[in-house]
Amino acid sequence: MEAQAVPEGSGPSTASPRTAPPVTVLVMRQDEAEADGALRPGLAGSEAAADAEDEAGDDDADLLDTSDPAGGGESAASPEELEDEDAEGGGAARRRGSKTCTYEGCRETTSQVAKQRKPWMCKKHRNKMYKDKYKKKKSDQALGSGGPSAASTGNVKLEESTDNILSIVKQRTGSFGDRPARPTLLEQVLNQKRLSLLRSPEVVQFLQKQQQLLNQQVLEQRQQHFPGAPV
C-alpha cells in the first residue's frame, strides 16, 4: 500500500495564485489485498475454534454439574432444603407412628407406642378410668350387701351358732347307744390338776383325818343306839 499526493485541479492550463492542500489517496496493491484476504479467513477460523472450545468447556461443566456426587446418589442441595426435607420426613414418620388418646375429647398424642394395633390412652385418663372402675365395684358391693342379703347373712350366722352348740353338746353327752363323748382338752387338763392335788401329802393327811373323824362318829352313834354292843 502506498500513499500518493495528488494536487486538485492539476492541468497545464490551470493556474491559481493559491496552492490547494494535497489530498492523500490510499492505493492498495494486489499482493497486499491478497495477503489481507488470506489473513481474514485465518482470523475467522481461529475465532470459530475458540468459540467451539468455549462451548465444549460449557458442555463439560454441565456434565460435571449433573453427575452424581462422590458421597451419594442424590443431587447436591442447600442445607436449608435438606433441613426442610428432614423436617417433612420426620413429620410424616410421626404421623404414621403416632397414636391419639381414645378418651372422648382428648387430643393428646404420642409416638412411643409398643403395639400399634392396640388402642392407646393417656396417663391422666387411664388413671381416671381405673378409679371409676374401682368406685363402681365398691358401690356394687355396697348395694349387694344391703337389704335381703343382710338378713340372709344373719340367718346364716344364727344357723352356724346353733350347729356349734349342738356339736358341743353331742361331744359332751354323746348319743344314746354310742360310747361316751371324748373329753375336751380343757376337761383333760382339769382332771390332771385334780389328780395331782389329791395325791399331794397335805391332801392325803387331811383326808385321813377326815376319815378317822367319820369312823369315830359312826362308832359313837352305834354305842348310843346299842349300848351293850361291842366296839
Curated annotation (Swiss-Prot):
GO biological process: positive regulation of DNA-templated transcription
Record location of the Glycyl lysine isopeptide (Lys-Gly) (interchain with G-Cter in SUMO2) cross-link: K157
Xref: InterPro entries: RFXAP_C_sf, RFXAP_RFXANK-bd
Keyword DNA-binding in record: yes
The record's account of how the chain is modified after translation: Phosphorylated.
Alphabetical UniProt keywords: DNA-binding, Isopeptide bond, Nucleus, Phosphoprotein, Ubl conjugation
The keyword Calcium appears for this protein: no
Gene Ontology terms: cellular component: nuclear speck; nucleus; RNA polymerase II transcription regulator complex
Localization: Nucleus
Basic residues composition-biased segments: 115-138
Residue ranges, annotated region (Disordered): 1-163
Cross-referenced Pfam families: RFXA_RFXANK_bdg
Subunit structure: RFX consists of at least 3 different subunits; RFXAP, RFX5 and RFX-B/RFXANK; with each subunit representing a separate complementation group. RFX forms cooperative DNA binding complexes with X2BP and CBF/NF-Y. RFX associates with CIITA to form an active transcriptional complex.
Protein's UniProt name: Regulatory factor X-associated protein
Species this protein is from: Mus musculus (Mouse)
Species classification: Eukaryota, Metazoa, Chordata, Craniata, Vertebrata
Gene from which this protein is expressed: Rfxap
